[in-house]
């Protein structure tokens, strides 16, 4: 610890000031961080989007496709085919792609459901490759569509398939392609797409769960992908989906290219379901932008992809989804031709690239489609938000050195096994979850969703007893110091993996962490315990879902009668159960890290705080 003292044994003045005023720093830095995050949505504090890679040239790309007539005819034929054969019409699709002059292949895969009897499901994808006539075929672009018929709860995508078929015929007649174009029609939503990507790259993302099979043919390295989900031949607007697995984002240049083409084709659009705010520096404009900002934080924090494009990001493939919902009668609608031209423009722009996307941002927020917040801005706000914990940890270390100058390291080493024990408990919960679900279902006849919820709640609630085993067994200052470091070791890496989730954890956790273990009067200690209990990962996630349910039910956080309260509570409990099931399924099938973070990060850190 020579860095904390000078050669004559005196402590540097700066460290002395830090130790004396650490509490003041904590009181200042946290609200400054919150204010900075709120201010990032204000126009003067963010930047206008721009193209970093001029080779994309969306304004120079000629978009000549006119697919409306042929695509509508194909759509009618496809609807008749699906009415007779509800599954993926592989024979019909293969015939259409072959008539367009493409190589057509089928891809079989299987899913072994990871719970219960591990029931085996089978599926089939179909993909067609249009080989580039001008190069050695070492690079490719993917256009994917998930197959959904009219009975799907997510809406039919037959219009997307018809549009893609006609685009394939148009593309095949052109000679300027320098990259192969792969058209992929997938079955079983994200499972089919994940299986195809695994088979294409010769990997297994989820060994023993998704069995990807093999592909008869493939192309080169995939540069970019467009996932198309049109629910009708006439739509109101395009919803651009950008969030991927674990909060990953496509390169900002690809998003800017898509936005530019939508504007040029006069296609109304929204970004992740939110309209652009007014071009104004007024409070109303900031409020709209801040609402978009908070909405993006909420979507990204879940770690789940907002659409099928999100599975491409793991393989360094820049991708986004264009989703169109059926038009509302009486309002202006958009046909297939302008949407087809947007897709054509995107593919042609990527076709111009000489190397992978790398010049623009991969870490950003978009308060509107033409304004962005770069990592330099939001990480500064995050630093202020969590900086108080770091300074307080350093101040505690100095205090521990003053009180026990010869044995402070020994005290820290004695406290370390408790931290490792908490992590071991979290690892046990994570590794035994499938067995725990089977045990609960054996004892009580419950569905998998309910059995998982019962096991998770029971196992997590047992951590409330940890203070009984640790009280007075570890030096309180050493335990507080390690708790601060434990918290920082969670949120610091999380800020790079998923900044939105890290921000939510920091915003909820910093006040509770800083006040844990501090000597104070009994009434304040009781309030602190209540606050710690509310910030339990299980309870806090339930409260957030309840608030969302109330807003969805009433349009605000105000509940007017008991019926609204009952409906909101019922929706929150149902959503909370589904949250854990989906998080665990996403981990086993796609590698989403939300459930591992819950078991290995959030619960151990909260339990550590609870013992103080």
Segment roles from a protein language model:
Residues 292-294, 304, 310, 314-446:
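Non-cytosolic juxtamembrane linkers/loops
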Residues 13, 31-88, 308, 324, ...:
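N-terminal capping segment at the start of a domain
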Residues 128, 143-194, 460-466, 492-493, ...:
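Alpha-helical metal-binding/catalytic segments enriched in His/Glu/Asp
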Residues 2-23, 66-133:
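A non-catalytic alpha/beta surface segment that caps or lines the substrate-entry region
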Residues 2-43, 375-612:
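Alpha-helical transmembrane segments of integral membrane proteins
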Residues 150-253:
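Acidic/histidine-rich catalytic neighborhood of metal-dependent amide-processing enzymes
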Residues 62-64, 75-88, 113-116, 146-158, ...:
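Second-shell loop/turn segments in exported
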Residues 224, 230-359:
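Active-site-adjacent substrate-binding region
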């Amino acid at each position: 610890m020579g860095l904390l003292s000078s050669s004559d044994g005196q402590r540097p003045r700066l460290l002395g000031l830090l130790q004396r005023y650490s509490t003041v720093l904590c009181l200042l830095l946290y609200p400054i961080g919150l204010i900075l995050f709120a201010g990032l949505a204000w126009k003067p504090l963010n930047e206008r989007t721009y193209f970093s890679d001029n080779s994309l040239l969306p304004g120079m790309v000629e978009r000549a496709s006119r697919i409306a007539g042929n695509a509508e005819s194909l759509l009618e034929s496809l609807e008749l085919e699906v009415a007779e054969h509800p599954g993926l019409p592989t024979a019909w699709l293969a015939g259409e792609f072959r008539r367009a002059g493409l190589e057509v292949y089928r891809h079989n895969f299987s899913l072994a459901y990871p719970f219960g009897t591990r029931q085996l499901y089978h599926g089939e994808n179909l993909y067609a490759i249009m080989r580039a006539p001008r190069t050695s075929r070492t690079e490719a672009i993917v256009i994917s569509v998930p197959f959904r018929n009219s009975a799907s709860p997510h809406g039919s995508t037959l219009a997307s398939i018809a549009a893609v078929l006609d685009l394939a015929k148009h593309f095949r007649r052109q000679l300027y392609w320098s990259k192969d174009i792969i058209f992929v029609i997938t079955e079983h939503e994200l499972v089919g797409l994940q299986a195809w990507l695994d088979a294409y790259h010769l990997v297994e993302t989820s060994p023993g769960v998704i069995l990807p099979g093999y592909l008869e043919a493939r192309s080169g390295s995939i540069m970019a992908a467009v996932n198309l989900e049109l629910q009708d031949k006439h739509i109101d607007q395009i919803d651009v989906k950008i969030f991927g697995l674990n909060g990953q984002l496509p390169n900002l240049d690809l998003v800017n290219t898509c936005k530019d083409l939508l504007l040029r084709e006069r296609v109304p659009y929204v970004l992740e379901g939110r309209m652009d705010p007014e071009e104004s520096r007024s409070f109303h404009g900031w409020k709209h932008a801040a609402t978009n900002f908070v909405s993006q934080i909420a979507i990204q924090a879940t770690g789940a992809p907002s659409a099928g494009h999100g599975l491409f990001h793991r393989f360094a493939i820049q991708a986004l989804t264009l989703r169109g919902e059926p038009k509302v009668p009486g309002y202006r609608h958009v046909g297939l031709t302008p949407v087809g031209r947007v897709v054509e423009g995107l593919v042609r722009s990527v076709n111009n690239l000489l190397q992978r996307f790398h010049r623009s941002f991969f870490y950003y927020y978009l308060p509107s489609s033409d304004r962005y917040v770069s990592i330099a801005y939001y990480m500064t706000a995050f630093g202020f938000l969590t900086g108080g914990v770091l300074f307080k940890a350093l101040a505690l270390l100095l205090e521990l050195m003053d009180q026990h100058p010869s044995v402070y390291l020994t005290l820290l080493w004695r406290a370390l096994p408790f931290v490792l024990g908490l992590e071991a408990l979290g690892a046990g919960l994570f590794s035994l979850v499938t067995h725990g679900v089977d045990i609960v279902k054996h004892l009580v006849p419950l569905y998998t969703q309910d059995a998982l919820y019962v096991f998770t709640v029971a196992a997590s609630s047992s951590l409330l007893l940890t203070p009984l085993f640790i009280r007075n067994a570890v030096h309180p200052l050493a335990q507080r110091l390690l708790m601060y470091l434990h918290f920082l070791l969670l949120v610091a890496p999380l800020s790079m993996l998923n900044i939105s989730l890290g921000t939510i954890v920091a915003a909820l956790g910093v006040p509770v962490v800083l006040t844990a273990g501090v000597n104070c009067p009994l009434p304040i200690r009781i309030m602190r315990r209540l606050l710690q209990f509310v910030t339990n990962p299980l309870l806090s996630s339930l409260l957030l879902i309840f608030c969302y349910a109330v807003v969805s039910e009433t349009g605000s956080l105000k509940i007017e009668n008991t019926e609204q309260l009952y409906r909101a509570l019922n929706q929150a409990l149902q959503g909370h159960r589904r949250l854990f099931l989906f998080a665990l399924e996403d981990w086993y099938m796609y590698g989403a890290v939300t459930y591992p973070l819950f078991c290995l990060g959030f619960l151990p850190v909260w339990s550590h705080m609870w013992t103080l």
